[in-house]
Amino acid sequence: MDKLLINGGISLNGEIRISGAKNAALPILAATLLASEPVKICNIPHLHDITTTMELLGRMGAQLMVDEHLNIEVDTRNLKEFYAPYELVKTMRASILVLGPLLARYGRADVSLPGGCAIGSRPVNLHIHGLQAMGATITVEEGYICARSQGRLRGTRLFMDRVSVTGTENLMMAATLAEGTTFIENAAREPEVVDLAHCLNQMGARISGMGSDTLVIEGVDSLGGASHTVLPDRIETGTYLVAGALTGGRVKLKNTSPGSLEAVLLKLEEAGAEINTGKDWIVLDMKGRRPRAVDIRTAPYPAFPTDMQAQFTTLNIVAEGSGTITETVFENRFMHVQELQRMGAVIRLEGNTAFTNGVETLTGAPVMATDLRASASLVLAGLVAKGVTAVDRIYHVDRGYECIEEKLQQLGAKIRRVSSYTPGKIYAAYG
């Protein structure tokens, strides 16, 4: 099993290019199931979850082609299967996004209850209840969601009991081919939801209200082909900005979208970073200074993103002063704390809040990732720690970060991927 070895204590400097957003690319891949013509997707990140989704589409009978620029064209005109098997779905939560498109276009779908990161309950009830309100018959049998529709789904008014990104996306996709108009209230406002809506509209859908908490979808008879460029990954952007901040460095990130990161940029400035932005770039400069601790409270967009909580936990544990980090979106999302404590972090957990007291130095140690963003926080800790940190189970980080070690190397980090190591001899890795 691969690991990352990191020799910390180096100030990061340089520039890198940000990849396309995984959380936009995955629903857009699912949306190709709605199209009666091929759909081309550009700026798609090459990650394990993307590969898994492509394999799932291929098993259903879709034809997928990758061009010389690594863009993907998906043709779902000759689908033969309407089934998402457990052996694929168990590895990622986003696989449930095929449920709405399959049901809307083909009138049937059998999708295994999904897996993904172990960060608490992410109930699928919002998806099921919404599709039932649109006329679907749904049962859960032996771990599978079995959905059927007699004819087209029906437009209706839906109210989301809580803000759900995948729930909003699934119901929005299903509504594009429904008969009549669908209103989704308390809809997610995330940029990735907006990007999916733009792609669907390019395919011929009639969606309005993107970026607000009420989406209006006028159903159409069919959707056609399109070419769509996936928006930049705001969470990858935020992660590398934190890397620059906690190492006292200066980093420039290109091919990104500053407007989607306002809450994160404000907190980085509060931590002492100097930030400049352009249309598609961000420069962060800490000028060799130690960051100041900040208080964070996660909430749905446009508030501070839950997917940046773990990274800011790492920032706080090496910052001047004390800070509090409150998680309101998911429960059980502080599993990185125990591993950070092994490196010398001073953190106290009380319910859904972490209280941090910054220390001047972390110590490198073998640590184990438990989920995608927790793994990123451990890599960040390794960058600033004294000595060598070995991060195990990095298949988690590979689910969301394209070429993470290569990009960090471009910024000057001493980091490399290994297939095995001897714990007592990890300091020889960079001898």
Curated annotation (Swiss-Prot):
Pathway it works in: Cell wall biogenesis; peptidoglycan biosynthesis
One Pfam family hit: EPSP_synthase
Disulfide bonds: none
Residues the entry annotates as binding phosphoenolpyruvate: K22, N23
Chain segments annotated as transmembrane: none
Keyword Zinc: no
EC numbers for this chain: 2.5.1.7
Protein name as it appears in the record: UDP-N-acetylglucosamine 1-carboxyvinyltransferase
GO CC term, one of those recorded: cytoplasm
Residues bearing PTM 2-(S-cysteinyl)pyruvic acid O-phosphothioketal: C117
EC primary class: transferase
Localization annotation: Cytoplasm
A GO molecular-function annotation: UDP-N-acetylglucosamine 1-carboxyvinyltransferase activity
Name of the gene: murA
Subcellular location, principal: cytoplasm
Catalytic residues of the enzyme: C117
GO biological process: cell division; cell wall organization; peptidoglycan biosynthetic process; regulation of cell shape; UDP-N-acetylgalactosamine biosynthetic process
Phylogenetic classification of the source organism: Bacteria, Pseudomonadati, Pseudomonadota, Gammaproteobacteria, Chromatiales
Main function: Cell wall formation. Adds enolpyruvyl to UDP-N-acetylglucosamine.
Keywords, sorted A to Z: Cell cycle, Cell division, Cell shape, Cell wall biogenesis/degradation, Cytoplasm, Peptidoglycan synthesis, Pyruvate, Transferase
UniProt family annotation: Belongs to the EPSP synthase family. MurA subfamily.
Reaction catalysis annotation: phosphoenolpyruvate + UDP-N-acetyl-alpha-D-glucosamine = UDP-N-acetyl-3-O-(1-carboxyvinyl)-alpha-D-glucosamine + phosphate
Binding site for UDP-N-acetyl-alpha-D-glucosamine: R93, D307, V329
Annotated InterPro entries: Enolpyruvate_Tfrase_dom, Enolpyruvate_Tfrase_sf, MurA_subfamily, RNA3'P_cycl/enolpyr_Trfase_a/b, UDP_GlcNAc_COvinyl_MurA
Family matches, as HAMAP family: MurA (MF_00111)
